[in-house]
C-alpha cells in the first residue's frame, strides 16, 4: 500500500491551488511510459479526453489538460455527482439522522394518499442507494429537468413494475430522492450540508450545485467542480474516509458504498464496482474517478465522448500495470513531462482558434453571424 496523503506544507513548491502535493511519476511508483502510452492510445482512438489527474503514493504523480481546458476550470458534472450524494447519506447515517431501512414515503407523508400503490411502503433509503426502487426504466436527469412541478410528487407517480430490491434499474430519480430526504431532515440543501462536512475539509472551494423546483439539489447531477475535486473524493475513499488526520467519512460506510450491494454485482451505493477490485464514480461524457485500492492509486478523467465504455479499455490496458515501479527514472519522467506539455499546447496555435476582432460599434456587432455544423440538438446558428 502506498503512502497516505498528508497536508502539503505551505512552502511545498509542488503543491498547487488544490493543496495536493506532487511527485514525479517514477518517484510515486508509476511508469511514465505507461502514462504516455495511455495518452497515445486515447489520441489514436480519436477520443476527446480533456484532462486527467493520477494520484499514487501520497501525491499527484501525473496530470494534464488539453487546450483550452485547464486545472482551475470547473466542469458541470453529470452522474459522477452521485458519488458525492452517497457521501452525504453516509454522513447523515453517522449523525443518526436516518437509517437505510427507513421507508422513503415516510419522509413525505403529504404524498402518502395520492401516491398509494402496492410495494411503495416497502421502498427504503437503501433501495434508492442501490438503484433498485422497482421502476421499469430509467428517469434521466434530462427528463427530470423538464418537470416544472414538484419532483418528489412526480417520483411517487412512477409505477412500480417490480418489488423494491428485486431488480437494478439505473435512474437519476433515485439519487434525487436521496437529496430530497436529506433536505427534508436537515432543512438544508445537500450542498450546504456537505460544505462544512466534506467540501471544506477536503479543500474543495468554488463548487456549486443546481437547485430543482423543490429547493433540492438534483443529487444525480448538476454539481460544478474541478478535476482535482473529483480526485479528492477518490483519495478520500482510498483512505477509508480519512483526510490529513481527520476521519471525514465513516470507514465502514466507505467500505459498504464501494462494494456490490443490492441486486447488481456491479453497483454499490452510488458507486460502480468492477471485478478487478476497483470502483468508480462515472458521469456522462466520461467524467470518472476510479480508485485502485490494491495499488494505492486514484485516476480522475474529464472528457467529452459518448459512453465510458470507449475509454475504459484504454485505461485497463495501462492501469494498474503502470503501478509498482521501484526506482525513480529522470529520463522517463522528462519524456512524460514533454508529452504532457505538447498535449496541453498542441491545439493552441491552430489558425481557426486565433482571436479575432469582432467589431467595435453596435452596428458592426449586429452584423456578426455564427453558424453551426450539423448536430443532434438541431442548432443552426
Language model segments and positions:
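Structured C-terminal helix/loop/strand segments within mature extracytoplasmic catalytic/sensor domains
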Residues: 2, 283-352
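Active-site-proximal alpha-helical segments within enzyme catalytic domains
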Residues: 174-181, 219-242, 287-304, 316-318
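Active-site Gly/Thr loop motif
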Residues: 251-301
Amino acid at each position: 500500500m502506498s503512502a497516505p496523503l498528508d497536508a502539503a506544507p505551505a512552502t511545498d513548491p509542488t503543491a498547487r491551488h488544490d493543496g495536493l502535493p506532487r511527485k514525479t511519476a517514477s518517484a510515486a511508483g508509476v511508469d511514465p511510459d505507461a502514462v504516455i502510452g495511455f495518452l497515445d492510445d486515447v489520441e489514436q482512438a480519436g477520443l476527446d479526453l480533456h484532462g486527467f489527474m493520477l494520484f499514487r503514493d501520497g501525491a499527484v504523480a501525473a496530470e494534464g489538460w488539453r487546450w483550452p481546458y485547464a486545472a482551475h476550470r470547473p466542469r458541470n458534472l453529470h452522474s459522477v455527482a452521485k458519488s458525492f450524494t452517497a457521501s452525504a447519506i453516509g454522513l447523515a447515517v453517522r449523525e443518526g439522522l436516518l437509517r437505510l431501512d427507513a421507508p422513503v414515503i415516510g419522509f413525505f407523508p403529504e404524498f402518502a394518499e395520492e401516491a398509494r400503490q402496492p410495494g411503495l411502503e416497502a421502498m427504503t433509503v437503501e433501495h434508492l442507494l442501490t438503484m433498485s426502487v422497482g421502476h421499469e426504466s430509467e428517469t434521466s436527469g434530462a427528463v427530470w429537468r423538464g418537470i416544472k412541478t414538484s419532483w418528489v410528487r412526480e417520483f411517487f407517480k412512477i409505477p412500480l413494475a417490480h418489488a423494491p430490491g428485486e431488480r437494478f434499474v439505473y435512474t437519476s430519480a433515485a439519487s434525487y430522492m436521496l437529496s430530497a430526504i436529506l433536505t427534508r431532515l436537515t432543512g438544508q440543501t445537500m450542498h450546504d450540508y456537505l460544505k462544512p462536512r466534506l467540501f471544506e475539509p477536503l479543500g474543495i472551494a468554488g463548487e456549486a450545485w443546481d437547485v430543482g423546483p423543490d429547493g433540492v439539489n438534483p443529487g444525480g447531477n448538476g454539481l460544478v467542480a474541478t478535476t482535482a475535486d473529483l480526485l479528492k473524493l477518490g483519495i478520500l475513499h482510498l483512505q477509508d474516509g480519512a483526510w490529513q488526520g481527520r476521519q471525514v467519512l465513516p470507514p465502514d460506510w466507505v467500505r459498504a458504498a464501494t462494494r456490490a450491494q443490492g441486486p447488481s454485482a456491479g453497483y454499490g451505493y452510488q458507486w460502480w464496482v468492477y471485478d478487478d477490485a476497483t470502483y468508480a464514480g462515472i458521469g456522462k461524457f466520461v467524467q470518472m474517478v476510479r480508485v485502485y485500492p490494491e495499488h494505492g492509486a486514484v485516476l480522475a478523467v474529464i472528457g467529452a465522448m459518448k459512453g465510458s465504455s470507449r475509454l475504459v479499455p484504454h485505461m485497463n490496458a495501462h492501469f494498474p500495470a503502470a503501478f509498482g515501479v521501484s526506482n525513480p527514472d529522470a529520463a522517463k519522467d522528462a519524456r512524460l513531462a514533454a508529452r504532457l506539455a505538447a498535449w496541453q499546447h498542441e491545439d493552441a496555435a491552430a489558425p481557426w482558434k486565433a482571436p479575432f476582432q469582432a467589431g467595435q460599434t453596435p452596428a458592426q456587432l449586429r452584423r456578426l453571424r455564427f453558424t453551426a455544423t450539423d448536430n443532434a440538438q438541431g442548432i443552426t446558428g
